[in-house]
Curated annotation (Swiss-Prot):
One of its GO terms (cellular component) is plasma membrane. One of its GO terms (biological process) is phosphate ion transmembrane transport. Residues 83-286 form the ABC transmembrane type-1 domain. Part of a binding-protein-dependent transport system for phosphate; probably responsible for the translocation of the substrate across the membrane. It is found in: Cell inner membrane. It comes from the Bacteria. This is Phosphate transport system permease protein PstA. InterPro entries: MetI-like, MetI-like_sf, Phosphate_PstA, Phosphate_transprt_permease. The chain crosses the membrane at residues 29-49, 88-108, 126-146, 149-169, 198-218, 266-286.
Length: 295
């Protein structure tokens, strides 16, 4: 009996060793596949960044920010009018889109929550988050540009705001839901009105996260080209009149990159590098703000 028991124990131990060895082998395979996938993604990202920096650094100069876009096949020039136009479009899109997104997020997190209107709003918001930007551009073209019978900066502002609103809504709702309900209950116990509780407690506690979402939304719309092709278009002149077509970086880069002129192509690469740096800085700033909030 003792011999049989010893054999059974030895067989059991051998079976366990085989299972553990197979588990370790599967773990190694999964780790290798994960590392390979990560390196594959990093390879393309580094390649894109390297190409952008090496080809765009030559065009980075003071003239890029002080001179207007040049005529075809002309040396010199810059992107001053396109930079100013993009800044104006992003500014007004943020001014319009941010309050709408924050107010909608407050309703979803504090008032609606499980109501049918909140569910419908979340569903539509999810569709807008995943919708291609060109669809938004065509929509604004149909309801604004076609009705006005001309392109305009305001049409571009509306298109960019529509792209920004869903991000701000989602971020605001998620950040407000992270605030403990005990804080709300304590405020209600003191007789605080709901609007006062929201403004003084929940919004104050989640302001860093909401600000992070706003910065990420700005980074999202900063490089959008498709909506602006159908709305604000572009021009070669210095203009701040949003009732007319206005120069902007994404469309200018697209036009210059597709041209056969080397001078325009160099300016296009410089514009790409400028947008890349701006988006990178916005993402870093958003992460810093969110990290401070966590600590």
């Amino acid at each position: 009996m003792v011999t049989i028991d010893m054999r059974n124990d030895a067989t059991l131990m051998e079976s366990r060793r085989k299972k553990q060895a197979w588990r370790r082998q599967k773990n190694r395979i999964a780790l290798v596949l994960s590392m390979a996938t990560m390196l594959f993604g990093l390879f393309w990202l580094i390649w894109i960044l390297f190409s952008t920096v090496t080809k765009g650094i030559d065009g980075m100069s003071l003239a890029l920010f002080t001179e207007m876009t040049p005529p075809p096949n002309t040396a010199g020039g810059g992107l001053a009018n396109a930079i100013a136009g993009s800044g104006l479009l992003i500014l007004w899109a943020t001014v319009i889109g941010t309050p709408l997104g924050i107010m909608a997020g407050i309703y979803l997190a504090e008032y609606g929550r499980k109501s049918w209107l909140a569910e419908v709003t979340r569903f539509i918001n999810d569709i807008l988050l995943s919708a291609p930007s060109i669809v938004v551009g065509l929509f604004v073209y149909t309801i604004v540009v076609a009705k006005m019978e001309h392109f305009s900066g305001w049409a571009g502002v509306i298109a960019l705001a529509l792209l920004q609103v869903p991000i701000v809504i989602r971020t605001t709702e998620n950040m407000l839901k992270l605030v403990p309900d005990s804080l709300r209950e304590a405020a209600y116990a003191l007789g605080t009105p709901k609007w006062r509780m929201i403004s003084a407690i929940t919004l104050k506690a989640s302001v860093s996260g909401i600000l992070t979402g706003i910065l990420l939304a700005i980074a999202r719309i900063a490089g959008e080209t498709a909506p602006l092709l159908f709305t604000s278009l572009s021009n070669q002149f210095w203009s701040t009149d949003l009732t007319r077509p206005i120069a902007n970086l994404p469309v200018t880069i697209f036009k210059f990159a597709m041209s056969p002129f080397a001078e325009w192509q160099n300016l296009a690469w410089a514009g790409v590098l400028l947008i890349t740096l701006c988006v990178l800085l916005l993402n870093i700033l958003a992460r810093v703000i969110f990290a401070k909030k966590k600590h």
